[in-house]
């Protein structure tokens, strides 16, 4: 509650005094001065205030500017002023205002949103009139806001750690907040189907950052820094104690970006940043009851670095790039103005921009259409001969969720020459089908077989050249397109999609692919073979090993329940061994055997005397399972990836080295496979493998104390850990071969050298 005022010495290098401003403002997350008045975004007070602070440190003229109802977690965050506007950015705990405010976003955008409408958003107030606007929405918990000199607001949006490890997880990101845009996020629960936040109708990020806890963002060309840092956008990351410098370059009507580490400390739990009167950067740390400090960051010299001499061609390219961006930016501003006035006008120029190669122009054109009455432009979309214009225009129509449009959209959708589309158009084309399904499933059902065949024909592996394994567009990658295709095919009960999902998703090395495949086919009852059913439930059985956030086990439990309900009685009998198998079955197979001998390498010298071991490789594969090797190691498509992949181990090790590695696993252990020793403050020592969790911000640490038993997992409080160090001991137990005879060991080595 209240505020602190720090007065600096004339040198600006030391705090002279600290005063408590006793005012009833709870948790002020945003502060900005305007005309000698302080504007304060008091999160727990759920109100934006205006006040003055006199020389005696007393608050005066405290005025409520506007209340913002809702919760307080992802709440009322940062403030900034630019061009006569006060910008306020809020998280998804705050209710989106709908009274006494001009909403610049699309009126149909919530039609395509499943479930909750809770979303982070950017508001702005004209300081001269007090008029409020909803500038854009679809954020999660953006803490900071900064406006570039050209007028584009930027933020650093948080991820939803609950979704980590899933194909619908969205990492932290830098977002250019364009007028009327929707970044796509909505608060969602742990129910299926999940919400895939990034869709073609949403604004794409400028840059994905990854693991971090975003706090403030900052840019100020008046910083006494050399270029390029004077023009950089700075991101504050609380968790990793760092400040990133993002260098932005115009790309058409939007931006491209590259980030570098600017500053890092231990600790440096950065919360906010500002420019001081000396041009230096002032950074404050603290938060969540941690020590708070104020730092001054100054350049040794503000002189610009001497740029390398550019060739004539490079200079021409740079000049052309700037001119092109200015042209595209003018188009975007024209569209944004049309979107604001909402008056009847000649729409052909807007229609033309729907097919622009620039994603920001296409987005602005579609928003401009959506803000006009549909009757003014529905006919233009249906009559256009340009497939790209039709795609993006129909995306606007489909979001309105009017069932009368579904039949017309679907008829042309089936006639589209998708092979001629680029990746962005394929995402839009697929999204149209999904929206038609959501609006009126009965219309799509009448054309089910045609729709399924059309979708399967564009599965990436079947249409694109084999040499193309990954394409990237602002809408996503081919990997994500395949995942989305699987979801739509699953909704259509497409039996013929099972082999595609089995080959490309179930068998993928990507965890997200596996989950996407399991999610898509969880209700599918027909079209399975025993092999694909086994593959499905083997993956479900291994889901405890998946790395992710708190929500991942809950999602997987729900997928498993739905999948079990889809099994027939005959299928349950056919794969009973997989359904009934315990997670410790491999370990129990070893424990059930009697001791043969405590083998040493010298005892088995005759097996390893030749470079190629002759043995029964099929029986070796059986020994591989019985010795629990697959419990930690992958062999082809079988086993788990806890330890090194053994698929090609015969190319790396000769027979003697192979045998020694099995008999004495701690003889040489790579650092990433060592056990960890965790000493608690109580004196207890836990030795095991620390399970990598997607939610790295969890207060607990999970340790698997027995590498052969999945259920041997304990949780310890990170705050109670006294010391942590790596052990020289391998997680692979000694004596794994002591229950096998000489011939069985020979067969195992033969199998490892050359798998069946």
Positions of PLM-derived features:
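Gly/Gly-Pro-rich "capping" loops immediately C-terminal to redox-active cysteine motifs
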Residues: 20, 639-663, 675-726
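Beta-strand-rich binding/interaction modules
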Residues: 243-246, 293, 406-407, 430, ...
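The canonical Cys-X-X-Cys-His
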Residues: 273, 294, 620, 624-636, ...
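Active-site phosphate-binding and catalytic loops of NTP-dependent enzymes
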Residues: 668-672
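C-terminal capping alpha-helices of c-type cytochrome domains
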Residues: 38, 595-596, 606, 663, ...
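Long, ordered, helix-rich scaffold segments
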Residues: 286, 290, 299-623, 642, ...
């Amino acid at each position: 509650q209240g505020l602190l005022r720090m007065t600096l010495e004339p040198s600006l290098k030391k705090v002279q005094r600290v005063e408590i401003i006793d005012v009833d403002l709870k948790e002020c997350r945003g502060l900005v001065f305007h005309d000698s008045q302080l504007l304060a975004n008091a999160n727990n007070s759920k109100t934006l205030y205006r006040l003055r602070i006199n020389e005696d440190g007393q608050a005066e003229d405290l005025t409520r500017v506007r209340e913002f109802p809702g919760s307080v977690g992802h709440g009322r965050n940062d403030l900034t002023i630019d061009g006569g506007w006060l910008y306020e950015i809020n998280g998804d705990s705050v209710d989106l205002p709908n009274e006494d405010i001009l909403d610049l976003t699309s009126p149909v955008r919530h039609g395509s949103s499943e479930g909750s409408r809770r979303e982070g958003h950017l508001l702005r107030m004209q300081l001269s009139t007090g008029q409020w606007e909803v500038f854009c929405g679809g954020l999660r918990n953006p803490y900071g806001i900064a406006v570039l000199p050209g007028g584009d607001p930027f933020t650093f949006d948080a991820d939803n750690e609950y979704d980590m490890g899933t194909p619908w997880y969205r990492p932290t990101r830098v977002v250019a907040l364009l007028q009327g845009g929707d970044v796509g996020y909505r608060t969602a629960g742990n129910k299926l189907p999940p919400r895939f936040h990034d869709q073609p109708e949403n604004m794409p990020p400028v840059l994905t950052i990854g693991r971090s806890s975003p706090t403030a963002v900052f840019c100020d060309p008046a910083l006494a820094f050399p270029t390029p840092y004077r023009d950089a956008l700075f991101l504050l990351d609380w968790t990793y104690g760092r400040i990133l410098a993002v260098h932005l370059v115009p790309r058409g009507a939007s931006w491209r970006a590259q980030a570098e580490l600017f500053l890092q400390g231990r600790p440096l739990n950065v919360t906010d940043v500002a420019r001081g009167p000396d041009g230096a950067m002032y950074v404050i740390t603290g938060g969540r009851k941690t020590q708070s400090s104020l730092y001054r960051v100054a350049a040794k010299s503000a002189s610009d670095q001497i740029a390398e001499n550019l060739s004539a061609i490079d200079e021409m390219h740079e000049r052309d790039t700037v001119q092109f961006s200015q042209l595209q930016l003018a188009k975007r501003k024209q569209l944004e103005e049309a979107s604001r006035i909402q008056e009847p006008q000649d729409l052909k120029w807007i229609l033309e921009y729907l097919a622009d190669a620039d994603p920001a122009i296409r987005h602005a054109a579609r928003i401009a259409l959506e803000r006009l009455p549909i009757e003014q432009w529905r006919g233009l979309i249906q009559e256009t001969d340009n497939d790209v214009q039709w795609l993006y225009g129909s995306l606007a129509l489909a979001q309105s969720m009017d069932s009368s449009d579904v039949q017309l959209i679907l008829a042309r959708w089936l006639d589209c020459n998708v092979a001629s589309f680029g990746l962005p158009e394929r995402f839009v084309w697929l999204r149209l089908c999904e929206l038609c399904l959501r609006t009126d499933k009965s219309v799509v059902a009448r054309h089910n077989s045609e729709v399924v065949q059309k979708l399967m024909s564009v599965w990436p592996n079947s249409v694109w050249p084999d040499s193309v394994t990954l394409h990237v567009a602002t809408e996503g990658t081919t990997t994500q397109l395949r995942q989305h295709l699987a979801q739509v095919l699953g909704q259509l009960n497409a039996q013929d999609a099972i082999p595609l999902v089995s080959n490309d998703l179930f068998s993928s090395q990507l965890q997200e692919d596996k989950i996407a495949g399991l999610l898509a086919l969880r209700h599918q009852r027909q079209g399975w073979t025993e092999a694909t059913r086994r593959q499905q439930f083997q993956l479900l059985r291994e889901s405890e090993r998946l790395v992710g956030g708190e929500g991942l086990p809950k999602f997987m439990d729900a997928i498993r329940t739905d999948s079990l309900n889809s099994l027939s009685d005959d299928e349950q009998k056919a794969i009973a061994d997989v359904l009934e198998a315990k997670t410790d079955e491999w370990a129990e197979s070893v424990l059930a055997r009697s001791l043969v001998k405590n083998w040493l390498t010298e005892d088995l010298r005759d097996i390893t005397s030749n470079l190629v071991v002759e043995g029964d490789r099929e029986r070796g594969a059986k020994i591989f399972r019985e010795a629990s090797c697959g419990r930690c190691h992958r062999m082809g498509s079988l086993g788990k990836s806890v330890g090194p992949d053994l698929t090609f181990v015969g190319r790396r090790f000769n027979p003697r080295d192979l045998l020694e590695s099995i008999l004495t696993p701690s003889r040489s252990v790579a650092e990433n496979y060592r056990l960890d020793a965790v000493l608690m403050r109580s004196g207890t020592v836990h030795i095991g493998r620390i399970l990598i969790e997607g939610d790295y911000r969890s207060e607990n640490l999970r340790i698997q104390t027995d590498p052969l038993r999945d259920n041997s997992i304990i949780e310890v409080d990170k705050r109670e850990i006294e010391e942590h160090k790596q052990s020289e001991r391998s997680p692979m137990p000694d004596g794994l071969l002591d229950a096998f005879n000489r011939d069985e060991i020979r067969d195992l080595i033969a199998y490892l050298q050359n798998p069946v």
